[in-house]
Regions:
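Glycine-/charge-enriched secondary-structure boundary and capping motifs
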Residues: 1, 5, 10-29, 104-219
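Mobile "lid/hinge" segments at catalytic clefts and subdomain interfaces of large enzymes
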Residues: 25-89, 100-103, 158, 166-167
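Polyanion-binding loop/helix "lid" in catalytic or ligand-binding cores
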Residues: 80-120
Length: 219
């Protein structure tokens, strides 16, 4: 992967010692990497702006997709198992090239992968950091079983990204040109989190999220 993307890996660490009888540290490698951005105007954050359109782009959910190793699996079942989704280097290269080009053209204002919490978790993080709500349809009419719904909402699928833009028509044509699958999920506005029949108050959810460690410690 380092060679494919021409990115230097300058350090790495795997810890097997910071654990106790009740909890084990996952044997996941932590990598230190360096990057260079020649123009600070091309730096964007994982956030929304008022009236942004939300797109989910990249790999489609299939029967082979899974929620193995995901935050959803850890929280709801208190264990981690299964295999992560298959990594497609060629797709990732095409996706990143397209996203970087759109950023350099000032056509997208925010972007985030779904590697922590899946699509729903990533959307919530973007909303919390922006203090802007959203209204989205994340499940389509073809989603007819719970397994598929869980994958769409919580699957930490490689090759799936969320992008926010004010120029949806241009972005759609550019994605089509670069053979990138996309789905217009919704729009950013207000102080509510709305998706597929659910509605939550942004401020209340944000406070729960931001104060979770303090609350867990009983402070």
């Amino acid at each position: 992967i380092s060679k494919a993307f021409d990115i230097p890996v300058v350090s790495g660490n795997v810890s097997f010692y910071n654990e106790c009888a009740a909890h084990r540290v996952y044997p996941s490698v932590t990598l230190g990497m360096l990057g260079f951005c020649p123009d600070e105007n091309n730096l964007i954050k994982a956030r929304f702006y008022e009236n942004n359109e939300i797109y989910i782009i990249g790999k489609k959910i299939t029967k082979e997709s899974n929620t193995g190793g995901s935050l959803y699996q850890s929280v709801f079942f208190d264990f981690i198992s299964g295999m992560p989704d298959k990594y497609d280097i060629e797709l990732e290269k095409r996706l990143k090239k397209t996203i970087f080009e759109l950023i350099s053209q000032n056509k997208i204002t925010g972007a985030k992968d779904v590697s922590k919490g899946g699509v729903l978790g990533s959307l919530l993080c973007m909303a919390f950091d922006s203090n802007i709500g959203f209204s989205a349809k994340l499940l389509n009419e073809k989603t007819n079983n719970n397994s598929q719904k869980l994958k769409l909402l919580f699957g930490e699928i490689e090759g799936r990204y969320i992008i926010a833009t004010d120029e949806g028509e241009y972005v759609e044509k550019y994605l089509q040109k670069n053979n990138i699958e996309y789905y217009r999920a919704g729009k950013c506005f207000g102080d509510k989190i709305e998706f597929d029949g659910y509605c939550f108050d942004l401020v209340k959810l944000r406070n729960i999220y931001k104060n979770s460690i303090k609350n867990a410690l009983g402070e």
